[in-house]
Amino acid sequence: MEKITSHLWFDKEAREAAEFYTSVFKGSRIKDTATISNTPSGDTDIVTVELLGQEFTLISAGPLFKFNPSISFLVVCNTKEEVDALWNELSKGGKALMDLGAYPFSERYGWIQDKYGLSWQLIFFSGRAIRQRIVLTLMFVDRVVGRAEEAINFYASVFRNAFVGDIQRYRKGEEPDVEGTIKHASFTLEGQQFAGMDSAREHNFAFNEAISLMVHCETQEEIDYYWGRLSADPKAEQCGWLRDKYGLSWQVVPNIMAEMMKDKDEKRKARVTEAFLKMKKFDLEALKRAYRG
């Protein structure tokens, strides 16, 4: 499992969406399914999928949050035909944010919002070796526009095996974007590729809990470290969730939690659920005690 994985919050379509995405992205699969009972959202389905080699968690937890393009997933394709095939599937019931076609940076590219509202950028790079097929991309808008570079450097200071890669900046004449801010930047955290950008255009959206980043931890010391470095909004601290100073949502979770939630013993799962619903930062020993009963 990657150190950092993406968590997608659906109203009630997590299982349906998991089937859809694993059918669209060839060679993908559903890894695990579980249901957590007696949460504030009622019975909650959790589905773990592997898409093009990367893990995603999908949850059905009510209509509290909506996906928006502040976070999108860049899919790097081997051929232009693969771009077209993915576009044809993801565009069913969706809408184009940037039309499929040729651009100065790619012979074949398009940005699509699928039928669930999730944003995908599909791109073909000729002659380039592909190390990671899906790259989570952060767009800094409105109150955090112009802070993409600051945020990228901050994240690189928090995580290990991290560095900032290529940076493309806006030039004079590309208003409303400010000269020198980030047009596109690649960066690596825990050996995983990410991307970031600023956009000063008018947007009616921002980062929210519909997409959060899960940090998987082995020990309480790890949990304490990431929680202390990332959390910037005490009001957002709940059930392992936090919000950083840029508005991005994270979950700092113990690895053992996934195994607890897959347990066939409903009483054990219920005890763990009751315990973690009362927590802000996860207490690993308290979760183990609840599990043991």
Language-model segments: residues:
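Core segments of cupin and vicinal oxygen chelate
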Residues: L8-G53, E107, M139-Q192
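Short hydrophobic/aromatic beta-strand micro-patches
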Residues: W9, L74-V76, M139, M214-H216
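Vicinal oxygen chelate
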Residues: E2, K31, L58-S60, E81, ...
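Generic structural signal for short, solvent-exposed loop/turn connectors between secondary structure elements
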Residues: A34-I46, S60-K66, F125-Q132
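Hydrophobic-ligand binding "helix-grip"
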Residues: L64-F65, F205, E209
